[in-house]
Regions:
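Low-acidity, Ser/Thr- and Arg-rich intrinsically disordered low-complexity segments
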Residues: 5-12, 16, 21, 40-41, ...
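Conserved class I S-adenosyl-L-methionine
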Residues: 51, 55-104, 115-119, 135-139, 195-222, ...
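Class I SAM-dependent methyltransferase SAM/SAH-binding core
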Residues: 105-157, 166, 181
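Conserved Class I S-adenosyl-L-methionine
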Residues: 113-115, 232-328
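A short SAM/SAH-binding and catalytic strip from SAM-dependent methyltransferases
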Residues: 166-180, 202
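A short glycine-rich, Lys/Arg-flanked "PGG" loop and its adjoining helix->strand segment in the class I
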Residues: 180-195
Length: 328
């Protein structure tokens, strides 16, 4: 549940990286971020050899985690009406990569409104779905009545070791303050030989991803101090090599990463509605401005949208994401 534009408006460099939510950051999708710095040596602990007790001792709620909770609080309805379709696009590829089929015990982490969970149920899988945001869980439960849906947040999940055959996380790693520790937790709950598949927004952002961020920047709005970026020591490059290397570091094997490119078809009204409602990082920035500044951002949004507008007035927004998968 991570929005790609969350990555498009910020200075370059690792200090600006946000990390996924579909719509999505993300997600985060949050989302990817500018720059191509390597994983910091501060992340050099051995994730494969960590015991559950050790993980518990190391788990902290970072400032980034706290800002993500603030950003997404109560936003499920607005997200469903604006950016959810975008984030649902890779779901079938995600489930294929995790080899989700009839009888697979699958965990959908950061389920959002339940797109991946619902698709997995449609394949006959035994689905458990979690999200950190209660309003998302309410919608996911309605959309996936056959799944076990509950509130839970990385990097500490309420499941036994080796409980699942497969784990999927659609635009989720963008929205956690400790990505490597989160992956270690996903590895813990996946059985030996089980599979994991994750998506994040890539960097640099595709043109459609950058639209809202460009409008904010053109209006002269700067990043709010109460929304900290992902810390340098927890950051990683939003590239095929960087994403795959992070899974390698977390102890997964047979890791592979591929790029997904598509044009998201939407309308100007739908796209703007998510921003002005405060959905995701970029939406939160927009909605927190004065009425005058919001109007100025909207003016630039309308001007910049022209290059993506089709003959019927609808928008075709290019997006790029990374799909990475591996085995325990």
């Amino acid at each position: 549940m991570i929005a790609p534009w969350e990555s498009s408006w910020k200075p370059s460099g690792a200090a600006s990286l946000l990390g996924l939510r579909p719509p999505v950051i993300l997600l985060l999708v949050t989302a990817g971020a500018e720059g191509d710095q390597g994983i910091s040596s501060a992340c050099a602990f051995n994730a494969t050899s960590m015991t559950r007790d050790m993980r518990g001792l190391m788990t902290t709620v970072t400032a980034f985690d706290e800002s993500e909770r603030l950003i997404w609080a109560g936003q499920a309805g607005a997200y469903a009406d604006s950016f959810a379709r975008l984030c649902a696009f890779p779901v079938e590829w995600l489930l294929d990569a995790a080899e989700v089929r009839l009888g697979t015990r699958v965990l959908d982490v950061g389920t959002g409104t339940g797109a991946a969970a619902a698709a997995a149920c449609g394949r006959g899988a035994e689905v458990t779905a979690v999200d950190a945001e209660p309003s998302m869980i309410e919608l996911a439960a309605l959309n996936t009545p056959m799944a076990d849906v509950q509130v839970a947040a990385l990097p500490s999940l309420p499941f036994k070791d080796d409980e699942f055959d497969a784990v999927v996380a659609n635009f989720v790693l963008n929205h956690v303050g400790q990505p490597l520790l989160a992956l270690a937790e996903l590895r813990r709950v996946t059985r030996p030989g089980g599979r994991i598949a994750l998506t994040i927004w890539s960097a640099p952002a595709a043109a459609g991803q950058a639209l809202l961020g460009r409008a904010i920047q053109a209006a002269g709005v700067t990043r709010p101090a109460h929304l900290p970026p992902l810390s340098l020591e927890n950051d990683f490059p939003r590239t095929k090599q960087g994403f795959a290397a992070l899974l390698d570091k977390a102890g997964f094997v047979e890791v592979s990463c591929q790029t997904l490119n598509w044009d998201h078809h939407t309308t100007s009204a739908e796209w703007w509605s998510g921003a002005v409602a405060g959905v995701g990082f970029t939406g939160h920035v927009v909605a927190s401005q004065s009425p005058e500044l919001i109007a100025e951002i909207k003016r630039h949004f309308d001007l910049l949208s022209a290059e993506f507008t089709g003959p019927d007035g609808s928008l075709w927004l290019p997006h790029t994401a990374l799909l990475t998968f591996g085995k325990v």
